[in-house]
């Protein structure tokens, strides 16, 4: 069919071609998702819209496309409008990240601080003024194609789409579905050498400039991996941004009716009826995308007035598209009734696997928008269930237990857990009560199965009592050092996974931590980490992915602090810090700063996020703790007061790294720009080569002189390092010394007795490597 169209066009006189400019991207909204998707995936070059290129330059933010010579084809229309082009010939792509952090990322992945790469093929998709610019700078005519660019276009689309579930990049697809104009621009660059590059300018992301490469191939799939991402040039991003997206539909209130029915095999089916109040802060639609767990299928949808609602849901896809009746304006809501079901819960013995703890209901693209929830669960009466929210009603009818849970304040994530649990309640006056839910029968079954396979798994006695004690004691400790938590009741349930999860008033813990408690403190830190999220991540949320260490790093440190202060585990505390330090040292060859959040992990290193955001983030707080420690009395009062102030100031809000820095500076009383630059935004870790000598001076006193050589960091790198001098007879002298620059000689205050030894970097006050050498 396409050949039948192309061949006659080859004979159209050139004088008839290009007289009327093609319409830009703005057009009427699509009546069908699948039809518009089909048009996008069928994009191909037009024989009647071909231009010869000679030194054409396109500039988009920090990127420049210099098309030296070749042929440019406009692509077939989508919704009656031109939204793409393909170029074949010789060109150069230039890209210069504006910040040191993003330049370092480019070095890590491409070996250079700025790109200047030749290319032979370029595919463009756009909703901006690109078409008008091309028509202004080029002359389009009917011509015979020198080569076939269709495979180039087809392969470029594979990086944006999945034909299995008919999904496409949601921001590009929203533009094509809604026929809207914006600054949206995408370029797929096939360079002379190496894998392709993908550049995108996205006005719906606060960090709207991205550069991606091809991720390592998994089978035959093609997927992009972002290596650089930063805000667009021009007016600076407003201070205090606490979201990563704009111009996106959200859901401000959920009313969910969940049915968990037992099947004949003892499994649990899942079905839900959801009333969603769709809202927006800026005009959107009529097509708007949401996310939903891939194994959930939509049965039907209608508006609150009973009219059918048009939705699209690809098979095993994560996107859920809803067509509103019209474009939604700020202040308006569109209540949607959605009915869906699917394979959400698996069973192994008496363990139940909830496959997605957060995407079991439709969510906005950002995934972090706040909403209130009213959730009713219907499930087998012999199962216990725990959920976010306050339990407002519970009744049994026949063999069905119905419970209702509501939230009084907007929250970011809602979840639940259920199983053949026994509950164990722990209470102490002045502390929110804790209900522990565990299936000890499931543990016994699992132990038998593993023994049959030759695997011996230790099983601790008093599982629920052991875990319950850490839950209550960590709550008690955090309430003392941080403040009152946001929830009035806490549930600690077990999940058959190796990780933990925290939601408002609900903590899900790995079955392993119920099965046994290790001797190094790992389990106590793990349990307390999840409890600490009630303060860090829930009580105080993080602003953007750059600030996620304020949740995960803070929670890791909190677990350590609990181990140290509440459980008397000083040796375990410092032992764990040292193990984390070794993990951090392992990342020194290809480092990333904490500030990169989830982007610290990549195809090159999938463990970096855990090590840098969690463990190094905890180290940052530990260093601040030691920096603020009263050395004479070993009291944490200043540090504790600072943490309480931060929690009190930002409770119920999102906080950024800059917000935390301001609180730190208020309590320390001076600028801490250098500290955050080094440890949050930087990647350097110092090595200290330390020598000391002791001299007797007049009056029977002794003088200690330190010589410190600082390596592997910039010349202006500085830290205040704790030094302890052993004076014998259980006496010590404690000092802080400022180490700055490649070489320092530091004279300590005179001492009343001859030193027996000197400990440099006592209390692990600095994340560093210390090597003691002779004078």
Which residues fall in each region the model found?
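N-terminal, polar/Ser/Thr-rich
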Residues: 18-271, 363-367, 673-674, 678
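Solvent-exposed beta-strand/loop surfaces of large extracellular or lumenal domains
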Residues: 53, 63-66, 71-115, 119-123, ...
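Glycine/proline-rich low-complexity spacer/linker segments in large multi-domain proteins
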Residues: 239-248, 330, 339-378, 427, ...
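Amphipathic alpha-helical substructures
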Residues: 282, 610-706
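Beta-strand-rich binding/interaction modules
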Residues: 286-288, 294-305, 386, 635, ...
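Zinc-dependent metallopeptidase catalytic helix centered on the HExxH motif
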Residues: 353, 377, 472, 508-581, ...
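Acidic/His/Gly-enriched intrinsically disordered linker/tail segments
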Residues: 552, 556-623, 627, 650
